[in-house]
Amino acid sequence: MSLTAASADRWMPARPGSEGVLALGMARLILAESLYEKAALAANGLHAEDLLKGVRMYDLSRVAEETGLSQAVIAEVAREFASTSPALAMAGEAVAFQSNGPDSVRAIQMLNVLIGNLNRPGGIYPDAGSPEGPTNSLADLMALITKMRGNQIRMALFYGDPVHSVPPATGFQEALAKVPYLVSFSSLLDDTAIMADLVLPDHAALESWGDVIPMAGTREGVIGLMQPVVTPLFDTRQFPEVLMTAAAEMGGQMKAAFPYASYLEMLRADVKKRVAASGGTDFEAAWVELLRTGGIFEANPGQLRDYRWSGGANVPAPAKPLFAGNEKEFPLHLSVYPSTAFFDGRGAPLPWLQQLPDPMTTAVWGSWVEINPKTAAELGINFGDLVEVTSPQGSLRVPAVIYPGIRPDMVAIPLGQGHRDMGRYAKGRGANPLQLLAMTKEGSAAQPAWNGTRVRVARISEKGELVTAGHPKGSYRSDLIEI
């Protein structure tokens, strides 16, 4: 159970990988009982009869069996979803990172199509003219790893900490060791920086200029503008300016691509184009206003777009989910989720974030594994016991949190800890669950099983290093703030 699920009126813990089937079962009921919005289907060139043929196999009996949910609950939620306006169906990472994630996400999006929830307030919007930056797929990462293994990469520049945030099952860390020269732009000696031959620290965020473009669709063209609030404390340089300086030194086409004296000049030139595209003429006045408001929050009418369902009557059919690990040897599904405090680990060096209690378990200053009470009882595990979590890829030891908000056939470990370095507050604290993730293979393509790795859990001892806020034994004590 996530913080979102805990805030919900109803929690429906479907079996991992069955969420797409659940969506199609709801879609079948909505179509069969004519609860859809006719105008919305017509706007997308769809006919209910054609869609119903595609989802007819997803009857309540089958969906209940595959998801582990009751038929009555599925039907009740489907009818309530169709009769409530606005209603929104969203697929999170737990769905997208399954082996059948793409089709499951499309199945969930189809629910929004049926109730006319595209291009309207409270629904789904495409980006309204926001610039599209470069994207990198898993295939791109695997191709890079292949090149590094083949000694085709002579120098690598890193803005981030992939040594910590990329699952070792991909072979990334091993391949990186074959690159002769590594450059890191981290402001801390993180797991990647300690491997680097050269570290060029970036400004801190509060020392930096920049722009922020939301990934989610909005009706307005939203571009947030970052501006420094303090002067740089140390002899650092902002990452884009280092690249611009290097481009100037290289000359030729590289120098011509960045004809700016500074990153701020480049940022102003980019914003000037956007202001002109929106009909503005006085850029200096507009720039001052942008600094005051923090960005651009208006859509150019010529940039507005609408979503349309592109699949026609072809209903997405999620395949059976693939899981790494034999079910008999590894009976539990592993869920790895971003920490509310550290996200993927980038906030781990900050002691006030380490001190921030997890909103669901109240745990602080470490890692833990969440286990359902029924499962814990079967395994002889008590709250705070040190346990070993083993997958086909590896194992780690963490204390157990007995948590009713998780399915009995699952365990969950938050991301964020397990750093080799990154300062005194992060170094050697907790464990990195990414080391448990194995690879699944469908056809010729292998990918990390982000939410598709099976594990087993065994009790090691009664004493685990688990600290929680408000622990009945008083194990939580603040050395940072005393009131």
Regions found by a protein language model. Give the residues of each.
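A glycine-rich, hydrophobic/aromatic-adjacent loop/helix-cap motif
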Residues: 81-150, 215, 302-312
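Conserved active-site and cofactor/substrate-binding residues in soluble primary-metabolism enzymes
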Residues: 17, 21, 46, 58, ...
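A cross-kingdom feature strongest in bacterial/archaeal respiratory oxidoreductases
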Residues: 1-7, 11, 15, 130, ...
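Non-catalytic, well-ordered alpha-helical segments in soluble enzyme domains
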Residues: 238-261
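Flexible, glycine/charged-enriched surface loops at secondary-structure junctions
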Residues: 36-41, 88, 119-125, 254-266
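Long, well-ordered, tryptophan-enriched scaffold segments
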Residues: 1-85, 91, 239, 249
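A glycine-rich phosphate-binding loop feature that marks nucleotide/adenosyl-phosphate handling sites
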Residues: 44-45, 94, 99, 125-132, ...
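Acidic/glycine-enriched edge-of-secondary-structure segments
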Residues: 56-67, 124-139, 230-232, 250
